[in-house]
From Swiss-Prot:
UniProt lineage: Eukaryota, Viridiplantae, Streptophyta, Embryophyta, Tracheophyta
Gene: COR27
Bias type Low complexity, positions: 168-180
Protein name: Cold-regulated protein 27
Region annotation Disordered: where it falls in the sequence: 1-39, 151-232
Function: Together with COR28, involved in central circadian clock regulation and in flowering promotion, by binding to the chromatin of clock-associated evening genes TOC1, PRR5, ELF4 and cold-responsive genes in order to repress their transcription. Negative regulator of freezing tolerance.
PANTHER family linked to this entry: COLD REGULATED PROTEIN 27 (PTHR33676), COLD-REGULATED PROTEIN 27 (PTHR33676:SF3)
Organism annotation: Arabidopsis thaliana (Mouse-ear cress)
Database matches in InterPro entries: COR27/28 (IPR044678)
One cellular component term from this protein's GO annotations in UniProt: nucleus
Domain of life: Eukaryota
Length: 246
């Protein structure tokens, strides 16, 4: 009897221990599963995706546009100056001109803002100016107009060949320059003709002098060839013979 009781008690105790161990294992397994699920959930929430990246870019663009319109509304704002004097009679308050650095060059662009964004996106006035090295506020210069007379003054311009013409004041200077150039050209041509004529005269004089010198040398040579040289003693002897004969 005692042996049977001990066997039953030990088997019951073993079964209780096994139940407790299984409960502990299941609880540990549940805790690990829940921790793994929470960790995976946190990882999935903090993971950076393309969708989040696009949303981030859109939010940055929206904030930049808000700052731009707010700065446009605050630039040049003065309560004592009316809108007509600020923007001119031909321009609207919702239009501004800027210089933007694009491809290495400053370019002028016209920025038009809607009526509901003149005072900001949400209707609030912002006095913070947009300070960016890529954008410069551009104010157009006032163009001065030169008065042009309806009836230009007529001037008479004479050319080098004696012809006269009537021209307006706008083209008189150009015609004067042309006439001066033609006059200079005529003077140069006349000077060249004089120089060429002088060269021909000198050459003719030189030719005549050369020919006269040649004639003189020929005549002298002919006279020298006809004359004969007689010694003095022969001449005296000839005279004595003539006297004796006579």
């Amino acid at each position: 009897m005692v042996g049977d009781y001990r066997g039953r008690f030990s088997s019951r105790r073993f079964s209780d221990d096994s139940d407790d161990s299984s409960d502990d294992a299941s609880s540990v397994e549940g805790e690990t599963t829940s921790s793994m699920y929470s960790a995976g959930k946190e990882y999935m929430e903090t993971e950076w995706t393309n969708e989040k990246h696009s949303l981030y870019l859109k939010s940055m663009e929206a904030s930049f546009v808000d700052q731009l319109y707010n700065s446009l509304g605050a630039l040049g704002k003065n309560e004592n100056v009316s809108e007509s004097t600020r923007f001119g009679s031909g321009r609207k308050p919702s239009q501004e001109q800027f210089k933007v650095l694009h491809d290495g060059f400053w370019q002028k662009i016209n920025v038009k803002q809607p009526e509901h964004r003149i005072n900001g996106r949400h209707g609030g006035n912002s006095h913070e100016f947009l300070r960016s090295p890529w954008i410069k506020h551009y104010k157009p210069l006032v163009k001065t107009q030169i008065p042009v007379t309806d009836e230009p003054e007529n001037q008479v311009v004479s050319s080098s060949n004696g012809k006269k013409g009537i021209c307006s004041s706008g083209s008189a200077s150009s015609l004067k320059q042309l006439s001066s150039h033609s006059r200079d050209h005529d003077q140069i041509s006349v000077g060249e003709a004089e120089v060429s004529d002088q060269n021909f005269v000198n050459e003719g004089i030189k030719g005549e002098n050369g020919s006269s010198k040649k004639m003189k040398t020929v005549m002298m040579s002919e006279s020298s060839s006809t004359d004969q040289v007689v010694p003095l003693n022969k001449l005296l002897q000839h005279d004595v013979n003539l006297k004796s004969v006579s």
